[in-house]
Amino acid sequence: MELNTSNKNNRKSAVISGSHFSDLSGFYEEVSDVFMNDEDWKVGTLDGFDDILYGFEGEIIWKEAEKSKEDLGFEATKVFYQNKIRQGKPFNKELIQQKLEELVDGIGQTLFEILIEIIKSHSNIKLILE
């Protein structure tokens, strides 16, 4: 866990360490520690992760990204979708089923790919995978 604010132009540098987690809930803990150390709440959803990136400007260094890519890959994503389908409301079961089918067909995104997409959707953030 590391957040460095001493870079040029007051840009920040945040480090997400893949060695600190092996599943999505561990990822949420890691990013909560990195980005929200002084807050009363923790990230617990993909939308919540997206929300905490607003206002952050700088670079995110994701160490051991290959480990995270495997940990948050096909199997973890399949279980993630199956749990949402099983839970039902408030989730749109048809949409989640479609996402699961796309994943199984090899055209859907894994959790790792979704997280990368979320980070890259913020133009003020540079992502570095190590």
Feature annotation, model-predicted:
Residues 1-130:
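Positively charged, polar, low-complexity stretches
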